[in-house]
Amino acid sequence: MSFGDFSKICQRTPLPLCSVVKSAKQMVLTNDTTIKNSRLDIIDLGIIPVCYARSIDVANTMIFEIGNAFINIVAFFLLIIIIYNVRRKVTAIGRSEYSYFFQTCLVLIIFTLIVDCGVSAPGSSAYPYLVSVQLGLAGACCWMLSVLGLLGFRLWEDGTFKSMLLLYGMSFGGFILNFVVSIVTFKEWIQRKSDMSTDTMGLFTVMYVINALALLIYIICLLIVSVKVLQNYWATGAILLGVFFFVAGQVLIYAFSNNICEGMNHYLDGMFFGSLCNLFAIMMLYKNWDMSTDDDLEFSVSIDSTEYSTFNSDIKL
């Protein structure tokens, strides 16, 4: 696989973007047989994966990736619970920032359900735009994490207008870059190769290089903060476990999706297990923040049967 080429990736993994990018090479058999110079002017179906999870028909509605959809629905409700718990920690560091991040993840889950499950069918006029929005939201989440990682060094005060403006700016920048590069690639507004393959170099670079660098910044910052600053090794374990789940999910999606699909008789593919691992990674991300922060209610009042007291021993009521 050459850098910037989605043909091998899409032949092994049924990513939503594969329906809107084209390649002159199509791998059509499970023994990796490749057909070159396909008539893409006639067969304009994107890059077809060798194996993918079968669809089901419910009330005359075709639903794709039903297993992956189930995991994303679970993730949707789990994120609602996480957002509620984040909002409850009133004085915790990064409360507003992490709340906004998880809210963005919630919107990403909604668009993932739309493009993965066939709510907007591949081939429809709206599909390239919806996939671009999904990729834009994924990029926004990655870019926000780089800011959240730096927040642990207290370079600026959390929850302030400056802090939120920086977070909004980074998320907007990540969304715009990923969305624009995606839609320009899908609609082929800049150039078209002579063999009619989609030029995906820019999209590949943004998705797998720039966004990955943002994630790397977040991981490095959190490890430094948890080990050197907080000396909280439970938090360190949480982030390492999250990294493990995330990497495992990517490997299952991009390397073993065909094997899983064939082994499961087309009922599940790598997308199911990849989404499950990503869900665990998000849970570990939240757990790391939860263990690294306290609800410092210095002037909270507790009431017992005899008298009023506070958690600050210097203050008496």
Curated annotation (Swiss-Prot):
Keywords, ordered alphabetically: Cell wall biogenesis/degradation, Endoplasmic reticulum, Membrane, Protein transport, Transmembrane, Transmembrane helix, Transport
InterPro entries on file: Chs7
GO MF, any single term: unfolded protein binding
GO CC annotation, single: endoplasmic reticulum membrane
Subcellular location: Endoplasmic reticulum membrane
Swiss-Prot/TrEMBL GO biological process terms: cell wall organization; protein folding; protein transport
Transmembrane segments: 63-83, 101-121, 133-153, 164-184, 204-224, 236-256, 266-286
Topology within the bilayer: Multi-pass membrane protein
Subunit structure: Interacts with CHS3.
UniProt record similarity statement: Belongs to the CHS7 family.
Purpose of the protein: Chaperone required for the export of the chitin synthase CHS3 from the endoplasmic reticulum.
Name under which the protein is recorded: Chitin synthase export chaperone
Source organism: Kluyveromyces lactis (strain ATCC 8585 / CBS 2359 / DSM 70799 / NBRC 1267 / NRRL Y-1140 / WM37) (Yeast)
Gene expressing this chain: CHS7
